[in-house]
A protein has these predicted regions:
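Cytoplasmic membrane-interface "Motif A"-like loop-to-helix N-cap segments
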Residues: 71-82, 348-361
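Helix-breaking motifs and short loop linkers at transmembrane-helix boundaries and internal kinks
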Residues: 41, 73, 94-99, 111, ...
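Paired small-residue
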Residues: 99-107, 380-389
């Protein structure tokens, strides 16, 4: 129906299922928060800390995993990551203390970086004019793993006693990951003509062609470290106390030192190359991925943030029950199965830049009007606005990653890692801002940021889409 070859279809389905399973594993704790709290005698604050730990390492992991994917190929990296996910799931299911849970949820954050591996695999097997559709299906269906974990794992746990139900359910997700690791390695090879000679810079620097791009790369890296610093600050009593204030500042200083070291590495790596002529097959503009990273920080960051706060917003604004608010709030999340592939499909047919302009503008308007919603508005109007906002931004996710692989194919993994990391950075920043402002102001802040991203799109250069022979 979509014009994919048999090999392309097999690759797509094997890869989105691999991504789906990493998300099931990544979110396998959420359905059992209350159960774990009661069984192990944890406080609500400790559960909240574990939820934060679940995403702390995802930001750097996406860049590191993207780099490894460019270097070693997606087949090996995804298979290895699935094995790692399985091992962490099993050790998590055996944990008997807060410390054991803490270490395992930190490690599970690495699994959340698996998204970028599939972006590279799809980019290698699909032509440019079908890239958006394929990437949208991969990401849209794979992301559904988070929702699948929420409604399926409790059903598995119900088959066993309360004491061991959650442990068996979470260990089962690990077993699935391990089985799929072998299936993926056996049946989903890299393309035969992978280029092994493109410099991928394992230390994390992008190969750029000008000092302007080198300066821009240095600027773009800071928010990633900044988000990690913000995590540490939140764990020192703002609002959770896991570490002392002095230790938090020491860790922040250490992160800043690593950031400076990374910048020095970038300059050492690139300065000798800038003076040399750039082959046509390696030429690209770093501003392209910088702008798309801003887009994804908006579309994906907003998605995660609004999913987290929207049920509470409905409950307090319209005085409805917790159950009804949760059910209505889920409407924002479930559009991903259709909207993200739809955004990629539209990009394939009407162009990447044009599609992004329309989707960002639509999300801007929707969230601005959400900021006007109060108890005097009909509940149905708020739901409709949220659905429109969800569709525009989730389709924006698909349109964004329809464009990322077109910048420089040999660096798709690393570029997907950077854009993906920015998505998590956006979520961290939005949720932090939410703790300081009203829900109405929060939605307007999203709209204001969308306006800035909309302006940045004017600097996005057209993408060259090549058709297959």
């Amino acid at each position: 129906m979509l014009g994919f070859t048999e090999t392309q279809s097999r690759t797509l389905h094997l890869t989105w299922i691999a991504f789906f399973l990493t998300f099931v594993a990544w979110f396998n704790m959420a359905p059992f928060n209350t159960t774990i709290m009661h069984q192990l005698g944890l406080t609500e604050t400790q559960i909240n800390i574990l939820m934060i730990c679940n995403v702390v390492l995802t930001i750097p992991a996406r860049i590191i995993i993207g780099t490894l994917t460019d270097h070693y190929g997606p087949q090996k990296v995804f298979s290895g990551l699935l094995l790692f996910a399985g091992a962490v799931c099993i050790t998590f299911s055996l944990a008997q203390s807060f410390e054991g849970l803490f270490i395992n949820r930190l490690l599970m954050g690495v699994v959340g970086g698996g998204f970028v591996v599939g972006i590279k695999m799809i980019a290698e097997w699909f032509p440019d004019n079908k890239m958006g559709t394929a990437q949208g299906i991969y990401a849209g269906w794979g992301n559904f793993g988070a929702a699948a974990a929420t409604f399926s794992l409790p059903l598995i746990a119900l088959l066993f006693s309360t004491d061991i139900g959650w442990r068996i359910a979470t260990a089962f997700t690990g077993l699935l990951c391990m089985i799929w690791a072998f299936i993926y390695f056996r049946f989903c090879p890299d393309i035969p003509e992978r280029s092994p000679d493109f410099e991928t810079a394992i230390h994390g620097a992008f190969e750029v062609q000008s000092k302007k791009d080198l300066i821009l790369q240095s600027i773009v890296l800071f928010p990633i470290y900044g988000a990690l610093m913000l995590f540490i600050w939140k764990l020192s009593g703002h609002p959770y106390t896991l570490i002392t204030s002095s230790l938090s500042w020491l860790l922040i200083a250490g992160l800043f030192g690593i950031f400076i070291g990374n910048i020095i590495q970038c300059w050492k790596f690139n300065l000798p190359r800038i003076e040399q002529p750039t082959p046509e097959d390696k030429a690209y503009s770093f501003s392209q991925i910088a702008i798309l990273s801003l887009v994804y920080s908006l579309t994906f960051g907003c998605e995660l943030a609004v999913i987290s706060i929207f049920p509470q917003f409905l409950e307090t604004t319209f005085s409805i029950s917790v159950g009804l608010a949760g059910m209505l709030g889920a409407s924002y999340a479930f559009m991903n199965l259709i909207a993200r592939p739809g955004g990629g499909w539209i990009s394939d047919r009407f162009g990447r830049r044009r599609t992004l302009f329309i989707l960002i503008l639509g999300g801007l308007v929707s969230h601005w009007f959400l900021g006007e919603v109060n108890s005097n508005w009909p509940l149905s109007t708020a739901i409709v606005l949220s659905l429109f906002g969800s569709i525009f931004f989730k389709a924006g996710n698909g349109a964004c990653f329809a464009a990322v692989p077109l910048i420089q194919k040999n660096l798709t993994g690393k570029m997907a890692g950077l854009a993906g990391a920015y998505g998590s950075v956006g979520a961290v920043c939005f949720l932090t801002l939410y703790s300081f402002v009203s829900p109405q102001d929060f939605f307007k802040i999203i709209a204001a940021y969308a306006f800035l991203v909309f302006l940045a799109l004017f600097f996005l250069k057209p993408f060259r889409v090549t058709s297959p022979n």
